[in-house]
Amino acid sequence: MGPDDLINDLSTFGLFFETLCVRDLRVYADALGGSVCHFRDRKGLECDAVVHLRNGKYGLIEVKLGGDKLIEEGAGNLVTLESKIDTDKMKAPSFKMVLTGVGKYAYQRPQDGVYVVPIGCLRD
């Protein structure tokens, strides 16, 4: 498999991109004394990355290559997951984020509070 194959197979390219993003998140979380894990419940609801810090705070992250449809899908998934969290037993997430492969600027969606962040913005 070469670069041309990946360009023509966005599904596989997306999996590679997700893996690289999770690797970067692990580096950043480790620098803060935190960790990163994956979440999936028995009904198939999942979150690509959950960043946990030692103080008990955590964030939910979906990784998407980009595009309005995929960003909307990722944000919807995060909102659904947050609604299933029993905040009597654990804290609500500190943030929800869709990490994308495109874009120059990060922003917060006013309708649901989900941050949309291009991967390049994490370094700053």
Predicted feature locations:
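A cross-kingdom feature that marks ATP-driven nucleic-acid transaction machinery
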Residues: 1-124
